Amino acid sequence: MAISFRTLALLTLSVLLISISLGVVTATESQRNEGEVLTMYEQWLVENGKNYNGLGEKERRFKIFKDNLKRIEEHNSDPNRSYERGLNKFSDLTADEFQASYLGGKMEKKSLSDVAERYQYKEGDVLPDEVDWRERGAVVPRVKRQGECGSCWAFAATGAVEGINQITTGELVSLSEQELIDCDRGNDNFGCAGGGAVWAFEFIKENGGIVSDEVYGYTGEDTAACKAIEMKTTRVVTINGHEVVPVNDEMSLKKAVAYQPISVMISAANMSDYKSGVYKGACSNLWGDHNVLIVGYGTSSDEGDYWLIRNSWGPEWGEGGYLRLQRNFHEPTGKCAVAVAPVYPIKSNSSSHLLSPSVFKLVVLFVFQLISLALL
């Protein structure tokens, strides 16, 4: 039976009105009133141990908190999002305040002159589909906190050294970031004012090693008063130097991570409220501002390929202190510039834990031949 024009028009109008009504309800429900937000804020203050003493400071921070909450909820309402944002200890900070206190990565192009072919990806290389150095015992379980100090470079450096030391010796030792902050002043590292993992590796080599954080604990303060001379006999970990992964090449970076944790710089200014998922959000793909440690990679069935990154903002941030960042990006620099400045420490026999791809292929062929002969 044919539908009249009048009937069709009424049906269309009804659907439109229902859609508008649903939209109004959804919008109303998503908009919190001032009292609800204030209750959330008071609870957040308790959970994060915040206490403001300055006149009007609590009110000023509340306004910032509201703005950040709005940004979080607007992002999380997008059905096509690849990651979640959430409230955390940074939720009362402006973007400028966050960047000034928690970023600190510095890297001059001259420091990338030590590019090595050790992890240059070659056609035919066989690499694992996924890697997680936490499962192999090469990552200190406790996610560390840099605090309000731009010392991310020190944490990325110690994490990489902790990893290669465990891979080479079988011993996992948590190392001292504070020694680097206090004592590594000869290059372009400036304590809480920022620095780079490359120069930290140089310092550790030239200094004859680095002590554990049990001996030289972290304070997060930029005193420049080096206490390491008193601990000369307690050095526990040494390295032979450092090298740079071929830059702007995610396949070479993947190969490097298959061998050991790698220190990189990423553009992290927009990641203060990252909570979970594979980050595909806004960032610079040209140059980084924050040092972190890649400890693995993998593929999510929902969000695709990712890098597994250990941060130094404590376990309350992100996925227990970790970030999953989009991998196999369409630009050679990688997502958020992850492939621009990848560096790693080297230690005697540091490559002995994993067969080279070419040798691995020969071993696989040999095993298959043995199996074939056994079945004859």
Swiss-Prot record:
Glycosylated position list: N80, N270, N349
Pfam families recorded: Inhibitor_I29, Peptidase_C1
GO biological process, one term: proteolysis
Catalytic residues (UniProt): C152, H290, N311
Keywords on record: Disulfide bond, Glycoprotein, Hydrolase, Protease, Signal, Thiol protease, Zymogen
Alphabetical list of InterPro entries matching this protein: Papain-like_cys_pep_sf (IPR038765), Pept_asp_AS (IPR025661), Pept_cys_AS (IPR000169), Peptidase_C1A (IPR013128), Peptidase_C1A_C (IPR000668), Peptidase_C1A_papain-like (IPR039417), Prot_inhib_I29 (IPR013201)
The name this protein goes by in its record: Probable cysteine protease RDL3
Naturally occurring in which organism (per UniProt): Arabidopsis thaliana
Lineage, top ranks: Eukaryota, Viridiplantae, Streptophyta, Embryophyta, Tracheophyta
